[in-house]
Swiss-Prot record:
Domains (record comment): The presence of a 'disulfide through disulfide knot' structurally defines this protein as a knottin.
Compartment(s): Secreted
Organism in which the protein naturally occurs: Diguetia canities
Entry GO MF terms: sodium channel regulator activity; toxin activity
Name the UniProt record assigns to this protein: Mu-diguetoxin-Dc1b
Disulfide bonds: 12-26, 20-40, 25-54, 42-52
Record key words, sorted: Disulfide bond, Ion channel impairing toxin, Knottin, Neurotoxin, Presynaptic neurotoxin, Secreted, Toxin, Voltage-gated sodium channel impairing toxin
Tissue expression summary: Expressed by the venom gland.
């Protein structure tokens, strides 16, 4: 495998590739020399503002 390769449904979202709310993150992505499990995670970036992206939950 090489960096950026993914496992998951067609059209799934890669690591930090945009807002994942209501979308499907890839199951896994090859990052930093190993397979990482991805899931949509939301973080408070400012008061009353959340950003959500596909994050490494390995």
């Amino acid at each position: 495998a090489k960096d950026g390769d993914v496992k998951g449904p067609a059209g799934c979202m890669k690591y930090k590739s945009g807002d994942c709310r209501g979308k499907t993150c890839c199951d896994q992505q090859y990052l930093w020399y190993k397979w990482r499990n991805l899931a949509c995670r939301c973080f408070t970036v400012e008061v009353f503002k959340k950003d959500c992206w596909c994050n490494d939950i390995s």
